[in-house]
Amino acid sequence: MTCTLKSPPKMASFFLSSLVLMFIAALILLPQGLAAYKLTPTYKPPDSELPPYRNFVPPFALNPVYNAPIYKTPNSPPIYNPPIYEAPPTYKPSKKRLPPPFQKLPPFYKQAPPSQKLPRVN
């Protein structure tokens, strides 16, 4: 395909028009975003003069041996009870023992009593 002055390539015109639209959108939206950030910033510096880590009050006592919560008294019940572990169910065989399957014979395989004589097959 040859490119002449009468018909510019369609891909380049689409690319240029999309660039112009993005530039116009940035000119409009960027100042609005900056103004919104100026009015309601996402970060508020602390009001005190101390650094933020000095304002932190630890929730536990500073005793390294036993760090109990400050709000817990010695006579109060425990705050968290861990769940009691229950063993998973195990297989329990039935108490009634069945004879093994090779001892259960169908009626036509049962042996005839010794007093009864069976016909001979030659």
Curated annotation (Swiss-Prot):
It comes from the Eukaryota. Root nodules. In early nodules, expressed only in the interior of the developing nodule with no expression in other nodule tissues, including meristem. In slightly older nodules, expressed in almost all cells of the central zone. In more mature nodules, expression is restricted to the invasion zone. Residues 1-36 form the signal peptide. Keywords: Nodulation, Repeat, Signal. Induction: Expressed from day 6 after rhizobium infection. Persists up to 43 days after infection. Sequence repeats lie at residues 45-49, 51-55, 58-62, 68-72, 77-81, 82-86, 88-92, 99-103, 106-110, 113-117. Residues 90-122 are annotated as: Disordered. The keyword Repeat applies. The keyword Signal applies. Residues 45-117 are annotated as: 10 X 5 AA approximate repeats of P-P-X-X-X. GO terms for biological process: nodulation. This is Early nodulin-10. The lineage of its organism: Eukaryota, Viridiplantae, Streptophyta, Embryophyta, Tracheophyta. The gene is ENOD10.
